[in-house]
Regions:
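Active-site mouth loops of central-metabolism enzymes
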Residues: 92-106, 159-162, 259-266, 360-368
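An alpha-helical appendage that flanks or caps ligand/catalytic pockets
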Residues: 67, 71-77, 207-251, 284-285, ...
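Glycine-rich, proline-tolerant flexible connector loops at the mouths of alpha/beta enzymes
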Residues: 123-141, 286, 290-293, 392-400
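N-terminal beta1-alpha1-beta2 module of alpha/beta enzyme domains
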Residues: 67-152
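Hydrophobic faces of well-ordered beta-strands that scaffold small-molecule active sites
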Residues: 83-85, 124-126, 154-156, 184-188, ...
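Conserved, mostly hydrophobic/aromatic
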Residues: 83, 128, 145, 176, ...
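Extreme N-terminal basic, low-complexity initiation segments
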Residues: 1-16, 21
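Flexible, glycine-rich active-site loops centered on histidine and acidic residues
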Residues: 78-102, 163-233
């Protein structure tokens, strides 16, 4: 991306780091403190970061007059945002469902990913749940999607690591990534409440002494990350069936670069910081532990900033990616209004994941495009993120979900500058 001359004028009413939005070549870091004054900065060489306003990429010179809060809104207008679908892969043997069996859910997931790519979506992601009529074994599906698409990212949001053998998973992930040409984006996590009590026990896993199941999930994740480094760890047999390369052996197939495409699904600020320390990307969800009592999007924006701070402190050299998931429906015809026009959840909800864990569940967005655009501009977590996953009602079928995607891409995304 070329360097561009930029004149920046800011009205400052709170501490603000300009370097959070721009890579500065002549000014290493610019901190603007509240003193009630206007300050003019000449920055001869400013390079937009990946999540910086796309307008800077098009204009030779641009002048901005704003407070940090206004800047937050303007960044939403010119944003390089990766857009993906997120399917929970439900099926129900009901006449009202277009996905009435596991085969329906799997095959329609493949078809929808291909259709999403044709429409201009950037990714297709899938939720993984066990002991439920939902997608549970992601790697065959991801590999199949990889053979039917050419460009879009293919991922999960998320795989429950309490259920995973990290060695099998490293082999499966490597194979699926190679089949897709290096397009996997794997979201993993410690998991959510499941359909059965301690379901991971039926898969043969037990927490170590002093661990709970969340600790076990994080331990499995760390083992998985280590295996993806492709470093030898297994002592070779001196009399092997086939000739071994020199040194310790590692798992095959190995896919270089996959380690940098692992995301952690975080429901708290603490686990977001933990993920940053380990060099994982961040996936936020449609729910979060309620840590402040504020609306979900504000809590998630703070969570994202905590993640970035921890990432910087860890000294990683690459730029991390951050996603948010939202239910967004543009009401443009009678079908949309019939499905989502009335009774949509317009406010966050509070619930309990267990006896001690209070959680906040995000609202749905369903409105006419012009109203939707204004609502989404105010979502601070979307503004902070570089990737937006749109949860889709997969049981309504491929055709209708393609319509939902196309409506967002054509009636909402352009006005918000989502490229």
């Amino acid at each position: 991306m070329p360097f561009l001359p930029v004149a920046v004028v800011l009205a400052i009413n709170s501490p603000f780091q300009l370097s959070e939005l721009y890579s500065l070549t002549e000014v290493q870091s610019t901190s603007l403190l509240a003193d009630g004054s206007w300050r003019r900065l000449s920055l001869p060489h400013v390079r937009p970061r990946s999540a910086a306003p796309a307008a800077l990429c098009a204009d030779e010179r641009i002048a901005l007059v704003m407070t940090p809060r206004v800047l937050l809104g303007l960044c939403a207008d010119f944003k390089q945002l990766v857009r993906g679908l997120l399917s929970f892969g439900h099926w129900t043997p009901s006449p009202q469902s277009q996905a009435r069996s596991a085969a329906d859910a799997l095959l329609q997931s493949i078809d929808l990913a291909a259709e999403a790519e044709r429409l201009g979506m950037d990714g297709a992601y899938f939720r993984v749940h066990h002991f439920a009529q939902q997608l549970a074994s992601p790697f065959p599906l991801l590999a199949a999607v990889g053979t039917k698409t050419r460009k879009i990212e293919i991922g999960t949001a998320v795989i429950d690591m309490r259920y995973e053998n990290s060695h099998y998973m490293a082999e499966d992930a490597g194979a699926a990534d190679l089949i897709s040409g290096g397009r996997l984006q794997l979201g993993i996590s410690r998991g959510s409440p499941e359909q059965v009590i301690d379901g991971w026990r039926y898969f043969g896993y037990r927490p170590n002494e002093g661990e709970d199941d969340a600790d076990m999930g994080r331990r499995h994740a760390e083992e998985f990350l280590e295996l993806l480094r492709g470093k030898g760890f297994a002592q070779p047999n001196p009399r092997p069936m086939f000739t071994n390369p020199p040194g310790l052996l590692y798992l095959e197939p190995y896919s270089a670069g996959l380690r940098d495409r692992i995301w952690w699904g975080s429901a708290s600020n603490a686990t977001a910081a933990w993920a940053a320390k380990l060099g994982m990307n961040l996936q936020t969800s449609t729910l979060k532990f309620d840590e402040t009592g504020e609306p979900l999007h504000i809590q998630q924006a703070a969570q994202i900033r905590a993640f970035r701070a921890a990432w910087k402190e860890a000294g990683h050299t690459r730029t991390p990616r951050i996603s948010v998931s939202r239910s967004i429906f543009a009401l443009i015809d009678d079908r949309d209004r019939g499905y989502f026009g009335r009774g949509s959840q317009e406010e966050d909800k509070i619930g309990f994941l267990d006896e001690n864990t209070r959680a906040i569940f995000g609202r749905s967005y369903a409105a006419e495009p012009d109203i939707l655009i204004e609502q989404l501009r105010k979502d601070e977590a979307i503004v902070e993120a570089d990737t937006l996953l749109l949860t889709i009602p997969n049981q309504l079928g491929v055709s209708y979900n393609a319509h939902v995607i196309e409506a967002i891409l054509t009636t909402v995304a352009p006005a918000l500058g989502w490229r």
